[in-house]
Amino acid sequence: MLILRQKMHAKPDKSDELMAALAEISTPARATEGVISLDIARVLTEPDSFIATAVYEDGAALERQESRPEVHKVMAILPESLAAPLERTIFDASVDPALV
């Protein structure tokens, strides 16, 4: 199982446009095979920042979700929309049976 966490700091004049594009990702992504959950939210203390957290069965599910056209749309606008580099971390949440 993989967990993806991304934080995006939008330019103030691009924040609403980015939020609208991000909103288009959630429903189709959740229907993608192998996507366990996906949530995107605005950071309450940083109104121009967004957090995306997703849980995938495996790397193939992550690749399927990231190949969706809605994701490509967001990726296309990120360079002009972000005020800081995209923060992206992928965690391996697989449990070693020897540890249980």
What are these regions (language model features)?
Residues 2-4, 19, 74:
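Anionic, Ser/Thr-rich low-complexity intrinsically disordered regions
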Residues 2-8, 39-66:
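Short, well-ordered beta-strand segments in beta-rich or mixed alpha/beta enzyme
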Residues 17-23:
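A contiguous binding-surface segment within folded domains or other stable secondary-structure elements
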Residues 24-36, 55-89:
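An amphipathic, aromatic/His-enriched active-site/gating alpha helix that lines ligand/cofactor pockets
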